[in-house]
Amino acid sequence: MLHTLHRSPWLADFAALLRLLSEGDELLLLQDGVTAAVDGNRYLESLRNAPIKVYALNEDLIARGLTGQISNDIIPIDYTDFVRLTVKHSSQMAW
């Protein structure tokens, strides 16, 4: 399943998101959700322990001035890669 986090993790039900993640799921951080990619924050630590890959939309990182602050564990992607993720996963949950 593809999970997309659009909101800041401080404003989303992040605990529920973590509970629903399964092995093989992928999480895309976009819009204000990219703040979860900033190295050293508590939400990133939780994502590191999850059995998933985590991506962040590069355009949203740039728009928020975060490109130099994200963790090496996060995979920056562009809109083309975003489309590939949506095609790959038949189901999606937006947070």
Swiss-Prot record:
Name of the protein in its database record: Protein TusB
UniProt similarity note: Belongs to the DsrH/TusB family.
GO terms classed as biological process: tRNA wobble position uridine thiolation
Subcellular location: Cytoplasm
One GO term describing the cellular component: sulfurtransferase complex
Gene3D superfamilies the record matches: DsrEFH-like (3.40.1260.10)
Assembly with partners or alone: Heterohexamer, formed by a dimer of trimers. The hexameric TusBCD complex contains 2 copies each of TusB, TusC and TusD. The TusBCD complex interacts with TusE.
Keyword Manganese: no
Function: Part of a sulfur-relay system required for 2-thiolation of 5-methylaminomethyl-2-thiouridine (mnm(5)s(2)U) at tRNA wobble positions.
Superkingdom assignment: Bacteria
Keywords for the protein's UniProt record, in alphabetical order: Cytoplasm, tRNA processing
Organism in which the protein naturally occurs: Shigella sonnei (strain Ss046)
